């Protein structure tokens, strides 16, 4: 779990979710997870880059973790981030199927972002070399690959003029940020959290840089890379530090960091030195959900009872063994300890069979977990279970803890016979209605007996001074949703939903959200909304617009390079100009069923204010391209100037040599990413 770093006003870390679920071996699965972490970071960088002028209006430096928080709560930017939030097999499903249920009306940002993510998941960094440059095995005339994923390492599936082979790309790291410095600094805070810090080398990237942080660990007296877990992504952040709260004593941790932007990455730093917490490990948690799994009768009239429980998820030290005590009881008065019987089970085992119990009798069972830390034994609190071997009462078993009051009726079925409930707590897009800011929160019901819910909303903080004293509101509902009303602008809220019946075994679920600034609604709805409480002023409108868009093309060695230029009139510049945002896309001729325009994913680049020319290599021949240029100023972006250009045909190529393997379609190298 990641907590807010001290001193950061708006800290947010984006957790990575899996985007593909194709089966593979352990090594391939690890490589796939790494590629997906990089891909989602590239997508995040792209989304922040597209909103860079709006971000700069709120933050002095867009390379700030607050920009991620802003992006998640700004409507257009949050739509752009949506594909990397959800677990979705983008390789097998259409982006339209993903985005339209989330945004039925305006889903352009989600769709283009989804298409971009699909593209970078399938196409590796770098450009294919010219076909005539292939040599050795790479020049063999047969189809040895169809996609980049079939090639090892950084190699790409490229044409050699008579086939496709895996080749080392050119321009592998063009526009890609440098690796962070390999020295990582660890600070163990009094709270037990661990702060990991790093520093970056000179950054050649104008786009926002996302840092992907991974860790692995081993358990034992000494650090060991051979016994360590696989690398796992713990966070993505634009800051040069991360604060982790789930650090366990007795574990040896290693970390590594990669710098990623929209163009790609140079990979991770070397593994850090090992870190182990200085605090002593905690005793194991008390066993949970102890219950009867089975009762069976023996030929001699005695009864065997199987007791089962849930294993702890992640104790500081793995459980070495469990102690099980049981005795006959009368009216829940326990027999003296010297008459108790005892068994010991191994730590990985979550059941025990009590043999030879008397029928029609009451029994009490106590269970305790034990771990070993050197020569010290750490013991959990005991939990107890009262049950009867009477046939009619076998489902009426009560579980209690020695240190806690009874918890009610125990589920008589083992874990593998029950389906654990899952609920999804989600926040809709805030809206302004009836002169007040509102938001809809909804969830999935998990049981037929869960008819009424308590909804607690807590105002935690605001960017302006009007915090209203951290107010808390509690409401009841019979529905699986609730609309929270009379919210404040630019404020952070915590919402907790739980069943109204206190005896339910389902735990409460919480979610945080930040309301947008007042100016967002005032600009869109033109309603009379009082925004005096907000400190962020409404930016003046930018009128500057690029003029005389023109294009020239150079054909060399089978590649088409486009040079796009424009002019700007200084007379209409009322704010200092910071640069240009240039977006281009390949336009198709087929019609589409969704709301996307007839183009593939758009690609963008931010240019400095003194650059009036953009060079784009690897354009496709005889293809229509859409060019869009906007002026960026300190007051925001100006209107876009749009023009269509068609690339020239390629000259006749070398005679086609025979294939050893035929495919109905040819692989076409995609345009270079910017």
From Swiss-Prot:
Primary location: other
Domain WAP: 121-170
Any one Gene Ontology BP term: cell adhesion
Region Disordered, annotated ranges: 388-413, 655-674
Statement: the UniProt record of this protein carries the keyword Repeat: yes
Positions with biased composition (Basic residues): 656-668
Record-annotated disulphide pairs: 47-71, 80-99, 84-95, 110-114
Localisation: Cell surface
UniProtKB keywords: Cell adhesion, Disulfide bond, Glycoprotein, Protease inhibitor, Repeat, Serine protease inhibitor, Signal
Chain positions carrying an annotated carbohydrate: 65, 203, 294, 465, 548, 559
Recorded superkingdom: Eukaryota
GO MF term set: serine-type endopeptidase inhibitor activity
Polar residues biased stretches: 388-402
Gene3D superfamilies the UniProt entry points to: Elafin-like (4.10.75.10), Immunoglobulins (2.60.40.10)
Protein name as it appears in the record: Anosmin-1
Organism: Coturnix japonica (Japanese quail)
Gene that encodes the chain: ANOS1
């Amino acid at each position: 779990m990641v907590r807010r770093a001290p001193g950061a006003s708006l800290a947010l870390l984006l957790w990575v979710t899996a985007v593909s679920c194709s089966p593979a071996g352990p090594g391939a699965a690890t490589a796939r997870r790494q590629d997906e972490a990089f891909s989602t970071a590239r997508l995040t960088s792209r989304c922040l880059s597209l909103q860079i002028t709006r971000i700069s209006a709120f933050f002095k430096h867009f390379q700030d973790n607050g920009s991620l928080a802003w992006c998640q709560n700004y409507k257009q930017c949050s739509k752009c981030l949506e594909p990397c939030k959800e677990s979705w097999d983008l390789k097998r499903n259409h982006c339209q199927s993903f985005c339209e249920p989330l945004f039925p009306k305006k889903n352009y940002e989600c769709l283009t972002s989804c298409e971009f993510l699909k593209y970078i998941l399938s196409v590796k960094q770098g450009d294919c070399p010219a076909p005539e440059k292939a040599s050795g095995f790479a020049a063999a005339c047969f189809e040895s690959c169809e996609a980049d994923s079939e090639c090892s390492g950084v190699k790409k599936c490229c044409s050699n003029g008579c086939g496709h082979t895996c080749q080392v790309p050119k321009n592998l790291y063009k526009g890609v940020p440098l690796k962070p410095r390999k020295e990582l600094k660890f600070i163990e805070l009094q709270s037990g959290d661990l702060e990991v810090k790093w520093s970056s080398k000179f950054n050649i990237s104008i786009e926002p840089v996302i840092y992907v942080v991974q860790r692995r660990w081993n358990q034992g007296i000494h650090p060991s890379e051979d016994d360590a877990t696989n690398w796992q992504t713990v966070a993505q952040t634009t800051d040069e530090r991360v604060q982790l709260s789930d650090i366990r004593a007795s574990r040896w941790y290693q970390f590594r960091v990669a710098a990623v932007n929209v163009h790609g990455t140079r990979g991770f730093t070397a593994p850090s030195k090992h870190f182990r917490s200085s605090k002593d490990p905690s005793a194991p948690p008390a066993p949970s959900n102890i219950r009867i799994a089975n009762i069976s009768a023996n030929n001699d009239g005695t009864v065997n009872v199987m007791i089962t429980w849930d294993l702890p998820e992640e104790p500081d030290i793995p459980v070495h063994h469990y102690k099980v005590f049981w005795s006959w009881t009368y009216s829940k008065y326990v027999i003296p300890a010297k008459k108790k019987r005892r068994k010991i089970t191994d730590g990985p085992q979550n059941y025990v069979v009590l043999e030879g119990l008397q029928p029609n009798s009451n029994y009490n069972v106590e269970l305790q977990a034990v771990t070993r830390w050197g020569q010290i034994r750490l013991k959990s609190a005991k939990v107890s279970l009262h049950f009867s071997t009477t046939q009619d009462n076998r489902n009426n078993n009560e579980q209690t803890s020695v240190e806690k009051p009874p918890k009610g009726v125990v589920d008589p079925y083992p874990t593998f016979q029950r389906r654990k409930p899952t609920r999804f707590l989600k926040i809709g897009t805030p809206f302004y209605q009836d002169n007040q800011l509102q938001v809809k929160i909804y969830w999935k019901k998990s049981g037929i007996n869960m008819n009424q819910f308590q909804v607690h909303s807590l105002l935690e903080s605001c960017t302006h001074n009007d915090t209203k004293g951290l107010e808390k509101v509690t409401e009841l509902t019979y529905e699986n949703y609730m609309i929270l009303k009379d919210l404040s602008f630019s404020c952070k809220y915590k919402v907790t939903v739980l069943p109204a019946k206190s005896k339910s075994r389902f735990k409460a679920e919480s979610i945080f959200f930040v309301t947008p600034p007042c100016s967002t609604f005032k600009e869109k709805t033109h309603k009379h909304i009082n925004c005096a409480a907000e400190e962020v002023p409404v930016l003046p409108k930018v009128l500057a617009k690029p003029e005389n868009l023109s294009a020239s093309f150079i054909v060399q060695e089978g590649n088409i390079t486009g040079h796009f230029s424009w002019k700007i009139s200084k007379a209409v510049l009322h704010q200092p100009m910071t640069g240009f945002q240039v977006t281009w896309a390949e336009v198709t001729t087929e019609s589409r069923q969704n709301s996307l325009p007839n183009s593939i994913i758009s690609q963008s680049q931010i240019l400095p204010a003194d650059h009036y020319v953009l060079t784009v290599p690897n354009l496709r021949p005889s293809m229509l391209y859409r060019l869009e240029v906007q002026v960026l100023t300190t007051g925001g972006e100006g209107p876009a100037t749009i023009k269509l250009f068609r690339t020239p045909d390629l000259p006749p190529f070398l005679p086609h040599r025979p294939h050893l393997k035929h495919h109905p379609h040819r692989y076409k190298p995609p345009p270079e990413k910017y």
